[in-house]
């Protein structure tokens, strides 16, 4: 796992420079990586969702905070960055490596890390050193609370296979929402 984290950090440094210097084309690059991560998440499924019905939980995804009708791109970037960082935190935790196929997990983490670099590069370009607005702070807090509930759920369920399956499906939904947000923002630009 330590090698995986070191590898991801090297990728972060290597991919940060082109993102900043080539300009921000976030909807195109991010959506491609997001779609690949979604596909990999489907492949990671180890249990039938039907066998884990008793473990299902509503984590309260902050849909209003990632709704393109209510959020501008400059506001969306910090929220999507936080969402991606939190997903990456879950999948790089020591307990996740025992739950998933190592090759698929590495691929998902690599894609998430590249997405995070894209988002952070755009954040630096668009926001610079400006402070976050109260709306952005509220949105970031909602995302953090959402992922805290997921982390607590995993801990309470002792990182059981069904708990991981529920979380995998929930993360798939969260990534799908971020893809929809970016698609709508991209349409607004055109």
From Swiss-Prot:
Q: List GO molecular-function terms, semicolon-separated.
A: cytokine activity; cytokine receptor binding
The cellular location(s) given in this protein's UniProt record come to: Secreted
Q: Which residues are glycosylated?
A: 101
Instruction: Give a GO cellular-component term.
Output: extracellular space
PROSITE patterns associated with the record: INTERFERON_A_B_D
GO terms, biological process = defense response to virus
Pfam family membership, one: Interferon
- Where does the signal peptide begin and end? 1-23
Main localization of the protein described in the UniProt heading: secreted
Cysteine pairs bridged by disulfides in the record: 24-122, 52-162
- What are the UniProt keywords, alphabetically? Antiviral defense, Cytokine, Disulfide bond, Glycoprotein, Secreted, Signal
InterPro entries recorded: 4_helix_cytokine-like_core (IPR009079), Interferon_alpha/beta/delta (IPR000471)
The organism's place on the tree of life at top rank: Eukaryota
PANTHER family per the record? ALPHA-INTERFERON-RELATED, TYPE I INTERFERON
Functional note: Produced by macrophages, IFN-alpha have antiviral activities. Interferon stimulates the production of two enzymes: a protein kinase and an oligoadenylate synthetase.
Give the family this protein belongs to, as stated in its UniProt record.
Belongs to the alpha/beta interferon family.
Name of the protein in question: Interferon alpha-7
- Give the originating organism: Mus musculus (Mouse)
